[in-house]
């Protein structure tokens, strides 16, 4: 078991992180190190019961040494950045620093969950920093001395139930998603 490669998963208790941890554990080819700000949380303990190793690794600026420790000994790392409020977004800096910590720890391969660069695509007409900042982090990771893979996922269906709760109006199902008219 000690020869089995370790994959560290940042944001392991998030929707995406939990899915990655569970999939890797089910595959059985890797040991999974689940990075979370609170290893004592119910969600983290659930991952531990499934076979993940829990380590402290908060997705917040100033956790650089914590990240290096969490990534140490891992062959690869799955990284996410949490969406942050548009004003004062530090997602780009956070993503770069997490990736740098993985490289400093000796990780050989980074998998990063990214999105499209909306600023570039629209010539700056549409403001979507949670997309653009992730794309900029992917560009940064591409320049690091490690192998890298980037995944772009669709909208999470569960977000409909949490943020855009469907409702019935006049006999029609309405999904209150904010989209431009064009």
Please describe what each predicted stretch is.
Residues 1-46, 61-72, 76-93, 100-109, ...:
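Oxidoreductase cofactor-interface core, primarily capturing Rossmann-like NAD(P)-dependent enzymes
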